[in-house]
Curated annotation (Swiss-Prot):
Role of this protein: Promotes colloidosmotic lysis by binding to the midgut epithelial cells of Coleoptera.
Species: Bacillus thuringiensis subsp. san diego
The keyword Zinc is assigned to this record: no
Region of interest (Disordered), residue spans: 1-20
Protein name, entry field: Pesticidal crystal protein Cry3Aa
Any GO molecular function: signaling receptor binding
Gene3D superfamilies tied to this protein: Galactose-binding domain-like (2.60.120.260), Pesticidal crystal protein, central domain (2.100.10.10), Pesticidal crystal protein, N-terminal domain (1.20.190.10)
Composition skew (Basic and acidic residues), residue ranges: 1-13
Coiled coil (UniProt feature): none
Presence of keyword Translocase: no
Length: 644
């Protein structure tokens, strides 16, 4: 049994030390080993490296697009479920100010994907989409204005005329979305329009739910309200599957063999996660019949920032696509950054004063989700030290920013790159204190050339960064450049919504991804999520206890809950829930898929338990029975619904 599901795939062969001699040349050689460097003096070298140290692909426009996507998701996480009163109008207002102050954000959404795919949308298609978006903006603004007035007016002043007016504006906006969505999925441009499609789909679904909240007040017949609900369910599935399909198509097109192709591949994966996949993970929560209360949920997926390098064009020395992709961590139980041990080596320089020390390799230690005291230490990445090691301990504090210095040297006839210093900004949300820790190679550290905020901007700029940040660091890897020309660190981040303590809210519906379990039993493993779950999922192939997750109830309020499990299964099964080993809920649930089926939105169902329970313990076990040979059960989340 491998209780933490951390197995052979985490093993990376440690490279040999390949010590660099420290008796380096302090001044330029009388005879240059490389003829191309004969006439290159030190100032020219510095100018050359400075010119090559500008990251052209991370433009301010791209950063702004990503920030808007992150901001929309962050705002939604604060209102999903059933927001009452002014909270809904306030969200609409903020949302419109974010993505619809003009047509410029929508143009930027399109240009972002055009840059990633190195392909342009034809003018006719772009102009048609922008025209549709302008019409949608007008409709939505008119509807939100009417909704605001409706909420402000006393019930006694609401009459058939005002009811008819808001029904008219709602129906106009809703039907305009249905008619416009094909303009964001024009054949041949589906990938390039994907961010636009996802944002428009999100607005449509969020709008549709209002019929369930206000439909009766507005004077709709029950049959009309039911029809809107049926449409919402159908479009949630349609929009989700469209986004997943075309995300995958775009990602597959960018697979390559070189380091440069991996950088672009990873940028697409990261940026489309932030602007598309994170968004569609929230679509089901707009179903106010299933979620009649506010919802506390989390995004547990990982995103990787660009490698930290001192030059843009590594000219074939930046390792290979497969070398990086194959060694990225495979699906695993969620964990938190605990410690990084930095190894440092010396890089001599042809000009003497361009010599530097650099981050040559590292171990990283993590801790599983609450419930276990284990510390998991990674295999070694990179080259081991010729200098003293440095240990930075984070102990679960949230590292929300990394700023790196890099340097370059010529030795003896080629350019070497290294990361010389990294400042980590961290925040303790228990004490409300911000601080920094620094890896410092302590020799010729060069200039700042990389900042994680450029790629993972904050949710909001209205708060200090330690409060408004969007992501926290949870893993660090280091890859060797070809020809031993240095190392390339790559940092992994997760969303700030993740709750270390797995707190169960006594007033909200709490969703806990099962990937936050601290222990898996035989036959249970972590597999890649199907893109729309906000993270990876658990697969069970054997009968018995599947996973144990630690939960922290709200002890300030005595509350009972009902449980639901978001699952897919190839057979009819029985789920059993136990607290500290004592079963309290058990029921059988239907098969949802056939063996071999690809997981799509409709593959999953909710297993609802009717018997309320109190959280009298902390260790929640989920058991599965009813599986035969070849059967599989996939578990995404468990939900805790307060019983009033």
């Amino acid at each position: 049994m491998n209780p933490n599901n951390r197995s052979e795939h985490d093993t990376i062969k440690t490279t040999e030390n390949n010590e660099v001699p420290t008796n380096h040349v302090q001044y330029p050689l009388a005879e240059t080993p490389n003829p191309t460097l004969e006439d290159l003096n030190y100032k020219e070298f510095l100018r050359m490296t400075a010119d090559n140290n500008t990251e052209a692909l991370d433009s301010s426009t791209t950063k702004d697009v990503i920030q808007k996507g992150i901001s929309v998701v962050g705002d939604l996480l604060g209102v999903v479920g059933f927001p009452f009163g002014g909270a809904l109008v306030s969200f609409y207002t903020n949302f419109l100010n974010t993505i619809w102050p003009s047509e410029d954000p929508w143009k930027a959404f399109m240009e972002q994907v055009e840059a990633l795919m190195d392909q342009k949308i034809a003018d006719y298609a772009k102009n048609k989409a922008l025209a549709e978006l302008q019409g949608l903006q007008n409709n939505v603004e008119d509807y939100v204005s009417a909704l605001s007035s409706w909420q402000k007016n006393p019930v006694s002043s609401r009459n058939p005329h005002s009811q008819g007016r808001i029904r008219e504006l709602f129906s106009q906006a809703e039907s305009h979305f249905r008619n416009s969505m094909p303009s964001f999925a024009i054949s041949g441009y589906e990938v390039l329009f994907l961010t636009t499609y996802a944002q428009a789909a999100n607005t449509h679904l969020f709008l549709l739910k209002d019929a369930q909240i206000y439909g009766e007040e507005w004077g709709y017949e029950k049959e009309d309200i039911a029809e809107f609900y049926k449409r919402q369910l159908k479009l949630t599935q349609e929009y989700t599957d469209h986004c997943v399909k075309w995300y995958n198509v775009g990602l597959d097109k960018l697979r390559g063999s070189s380091y440069e192709s991996w950088v672009n591949f990873n940028r697409y994966r990261r940026e489309m996660t932030l602007t598309v996949l994170d968004l569609i993970a929230l679509f089901p929560l707009y179903d106010v019949r299933l979620y009649p209360k506010e919802v506390k949920t989390e995004l547990t997926r990982d995103v990787l920032t660009d490698p930290i390098v001192g030059v843009n064009n590594l000219r074939g020395y930046g390792t290979t696509f497969s070398n990086i992709e194959n060694y990225i961590r495979k699906p695993h139980l969620f964990d938190y950054l605990h410690r990084i041990q930095f190894h440092t080596r010396f890089q001599p320089g042809y000009y003497g004063n361009d010599s530097f020390n650099y981050w040559s390799g590292n171990y990283v230690s993590t801790r599983p989700s609450i419930g276990s005291n284990d510390i998991i230490t990674s295999p070694f990445y990179g080259n081991k030290s010729s200098e003293p090691v440095q240990n930075l301990e984070f102990n679960g504090e949230k590292v929300y920013r990394a700023v790196a210095n890099t340097n370059l040297a010529v030795w003896p006839s080629a350019v070497y790159s290294g990361v010389t210093k990294v400042e980590f900004s961290q925040y303790n949300d228990q004490t409300d204190e911000a601080s920094t820790q620094t890896y410092d190679s302590k020799r010729n550290v060069g200039a700042v050339s990389w900042d994680s905020i450029d790629q993972l901007p904050p949710e909001t700029t209205d708060e200090p960064l330690e409060k408004g940040y969007s992501h926290q660091l949870n893993y660090v890897m280091c890859f060797l450049m070809q020809g031993s020309r240095g190392t390339i660190p790559v940092l992994t981040w997760t969303h700030k919504s993740v709750d270390f303590f797995n707190m169960i809210d006594s007033k909200k519906i709490t969703q806990l991804p099962l990937v936050k379990a601290y222990k898996l039993q035989s036959g249970a493993s972590v597999v890649a999520g199907p893109r729309f779950t906000g993270g990876d999922i658990i697969q069970c192939t054997e009968n018995g206890s599947a996973a144990t997750i630690y939960v922290t109830p709200d002890v300030s309020y005595s509350q009972k809950y009902r449980a639901r499990i978001h699952y897919a299964s190839t057979s009819q099964i029985t789920f059993t829930l136990s607290l500290d080993g004592a079963p309290f809920n058990q029921y059988y649930f239907d098969k949802t898929i056939n063996k071999g089926d690809t997981l799509t939105y409709n593959s999953f169902n909710l297993a609802s338990f009717s018997t309320p329970f109190e959280l009298s313990g902390n260790n929640l076990q989920i058991g599965v029975t009813g599986l035969s040979a070849g059967d599989k059960v996939y578990i995404d989340k468990i939900e805790f619904i307060p019983v009033n």
